[in-house]
UniProtKB/Swiss-Prot annotation:
Protein name: Transmembrane protein 79
Residues in compartment: Extracellular: 222-240, 301-309, 361-391
Organism: Mus musculus (Mouse)
Lineage: Eukaryota, Metazoa, Chordata, Craniata, Vertebrata
Subcellular location: Lysosome; Golgi apparatus, trans-Golgi network; Membrane
Stretches in topological domain Cytoplasmic: 1-200, 262-279, 331-339
Disease linked to the protein: Defects in Tmem79 are the cause of the spontaneous matted (matt) mutant phenotype, a model for human atopic dermatitis. Atopic dermatitis (ma/ma) mice have a matted hair phenotype with progressive dermatitis-like skin inflammation and a scratching behavior. Mice display an altered skin barrier that facilitates allergic sensitization.
Sections of the chain in a coiled coil: none
Keyword Transmembrane: yes
Gene: Tmem79
């Protein structure tokens, strides 16, 4: 191909490939490696800076021009693999576009939303645990606090939230049924318990008069001669001392249960083993007051022959309280029998006192005169009084 044809071809390709400068760099590197520079290379450098064609300003003859012409051909435009890539022309004139800040914000927003997916109650439940704090003894902790200054103490763990116990769980023991019994919720179990309690009270109603009559008829003792009202009241009070025995015994057991089960706090959670004895003592004291108040009034209306009932009723009170205590501690519905042996005599004495006060001797309701049952018509002289011979 002749030189004019080559120039014509370059003129036709110039607007299409104005940015192809890698062949020039390749020619420059090859010349630098050779160590010699030709005037054609200088013209190539000047031409590359100005942006005009290179071959027109160089010499027409010489091997360098041939190489430059061959390098500018379309089939020789591929850069050498080891050659550095040049910057595209006009890159300095391009204004840098501002970075879009919306993309990272969009990526951060779902991250923030994912961080708070757990509800607030669940997040509070996760409390960091320090194994050193758990394994540390109280003495070591005191030493560390003493050695550290006032400004060095820091709380790394957040304050633990106290989860109050729901009120439903406080009475869970009362709701739970015994494991050995199965109840379908039909209410038959409660009916059976009530039936047993009523049956035990009815048994006490039948057994109480039989026991009292048998003791009155067969026990070998008689009441002393008590002609005055004051002597009868003193005799009743002395008999009442024996009735305090089960109450004092209950107080002793109650105190021991407080010590054994460490239930010394007055407003602490009640324990079953302690509450049994406490309720027994409280109920016994109440019944003792009512029982012996009516017994003292009854002693002023009884004739001399029937004063033997005073010690018998006192003994019945003590025995019935012990029976009730035993059955109440076991948790049986049969405890109604012991309660009936205490309440039924109390009810009988109340009815007897009201009958004498309003029917037999209404004039002596609020006076302290002697009873006409003993004086003067129904009284026996001291010489006529003989104790019964037993044996």
């Amino acid at each position: 191909m002749t030189e004019p044809e080559t120039l014509a071809l370059l003129d036709m390709k110039e607007p299409e490939t104005p940015e192809k400068s890698p062949p020039q760099a390749l020619v420059l590197q090859s010349e630098e490696e050779g160590g010699t520079e030709s005037p054609g290379t200088e013209s190539l450098r000047v031409g590359s800076s100005v942006g005009s064609p290179i071959v027109r300003e160089g010499p027409e003859d010489g091997p360098d021009s041939t190489i430059s012409e061959a390098a500018t051909l379309p089939w020789g435009t591929d850069p050498h693999p080891s050659a550095p890539l040049p910057d595209p022309p006009g890159w300095r004139d391009i204004e840098p576009e501002p970075l879009e800040s919306e993309a990272p914000t969009k990526s951060e927003e779902p991250f923030k939303e994912d961080a708070n997916l757990l509800p607030e109650k669940t997040v509070r439940a996760f409390v960091p645990i320090d194994l050193q704090c758990i394994e540390r003894k109280p003495q070591e902790e005191r030493i560390l606090h003493r050695d550290a200054g006032p400004g060095e103490l820091r709380n790394f763990l957040p304050a633990r939230l106290s989860h109050p116990e729901p009120p439903e769980r406080k009475w869970a023991e009362a709701v739970v049924r015994p494991p050995g019994r199965s109840c379908g919720g039909c209410g038959s179990c409660g009916g059976r318990e009530a039936l047993r309690a009523v049956a035990s009270v009815v048994a006490a109603l039948i057994f109480f008069p039989c026991l009292l009559y048998g003791a009155y008829a067969f026990l070998p003792f008689d009441a002393p001669r008590l002609p005055t009202m004051s002597s009868r009241l003193v005799y009743t009070l002395r008999c009442g001392v024996f009735a305090t025995f089960p109450i004092v015994l209950g107080l002793l057991v109650y105190g021991l249960s407080l010590l054994c089960f460490s239930a010394l706090r007055p407003f602490g959670e009640p324990r079953r083993e302690v509450e049994i004895h406490r309720q027994y003592v409280a109920q016994s004291v109440q019944l003792f007051i009512l029982y012996f108040f009516n017994l003292a009034v009854l002693s002023t209306y009884l004739p001399q022959d029937t004063l033997k009932l005073l010690p018998l009723l006192t003994g019945l009170f003590a025995i019935s309280r012990l029976i009730y205590w035993l059955t109440f501690a076991v948790g049986r519905s049969f405890r109604g029998f012991g309660y009936g042996l205490t309440f039924l005599p109390l009810l009988a004495m109340l009815v007897w006192n009201l009958y004498y006060m309003f029917v037999v001797e209404p004039e002596r309701m609020l006076t302290a005169s002697e009873s006409r049952l003993d004086y003067p018509d129904h009284a026996r002289s001291v010489s006529d009084y003989r104790p019964r011979s037993w044996g």
